[in-house]
Amino acid sequence: EKTPLNAVIHGMVKREGFTAQKVYFQSVPGFYVTGILFRPQDAKGKLPAILCPHGHGGRLQTHSEAKVLDEIRIGAEKFKESGRMPKVARAATLARLGNVVLLFDMIGYADNVQLSYQLAHRFAKQRPEMEDKKSWGLYSTQAELRLQSIMGLQTWNGIRALDFLAGLPDVDPKRMAVTGGSGGGTQTILLGA
């Protein structure tokens, strides 16, 4: 059941051709999704929107100078500055092209720390201490029987992120897309199913 998002958008930063703001909203009561909202500067009317789930490197993934220089050498990257943080650069570029873009955090990454990275991505054991007949936690038999998992919660977060974008006054909800690479590509496939 979809509940109110109670979204908060704050902390605007202006850059050449776009703005960026931090955002958080509730995908389920008490559980927050975090990310960065990019908008084209001085755009008018309803705009297309793109949800950008990052991969396993996280939205704050940075490449070493050697990697960036190698990518420039082979033509995979053009600019040293944008090559350092490719996920943020992709979102900024899409905004400069006229799209509203949400680069949201997977569970355990960047600002999304209600469930730790270790629990969400490195923990794979049953947790009998998290289980009784009336309540349970992730990785318990009760949760598994109800198909409650990190992947399920992350997919729901993606669905709610699309709801968030669709509800923005400057977004045309009929022109929305999802694109991501690596783990973000997996999320793209799941959201498209």
List each language-model region with its residue ranges:
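Short, flexible loop/turn elements at secondary-structure junctions
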Residues: 25-29, 39-41, 55-57, 108, ...
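Short helix/loop capping segments that flank catalytic or ligand/cofactor-binding pockets
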Residues: 33-34, 61, 112, 188
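Alpha/beta-hydrolase fold nucleophile elbow
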Residues: 170-182
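Glycine-rich nucleophile elbow surrounding the catalytic serine of serine-hydrolase chemistry
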Residues: 180-192
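N-terminal cap/lid segment of alpha/beta-hydrolase-fold proteins
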Residues: 2-49
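Cap/lid segment of the alpha/beta-hydrolase catalytic domain
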Residues: 45-46, 52-159, 166-167
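Short alpha-helical segments and helix-capping/turn motifs at coil-helix boundaries
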Residues: 20-22, 32-37, 78-81, 85-90, ...
